[in-house]
């Protein structure tokens, strides 16, 4: 069973010039305030997944979900988002294009402004 959601970004052009139909995995906690002022983004680290940061997110914890709406986007290449292991040819496996932090930030920005806003 999948414990995260997927945001599809068709035709995303990477910094290295490849065009991919990106799947950005993410998980949210808490409730977004009407003005959006309680949103907190916790980026994952290279190879890390949303589940690696969940220990600090809960009512009464350092990132209190009674107060904050938390978004944890997974990086490209981590196995949940578009990765060599789950992207169809011609970009699957060894053909997966180079992706950068810039690409990740651009995808995460789109998640926040186009999908969760």
What function would you assign to each model-found segment?
Residues 1-39:
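Catalytic-loop region of hydrolases
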Residues 91, 95, 102-117:
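Conserved acidic catalytic loop of the alpha/beta-hydrolase fold
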Residues 27-89:
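N-terminal cap/lid subdomain of alpha/beta-hydrolase-fold enzymes
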Residues 20, 99-102:
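Conserved phosphate-coordination/catalytic loops
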Residues 7-9, 43, 73, 108:
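Generic structural hydrophobic/aromatic packing signal, biased to beta-strands
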Residues 12-16, 58-61, 110-114:
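Catalytic micro-motifs at enzyme active sites that drive phosphoryl/nucleotidyl and oxygen chemistry
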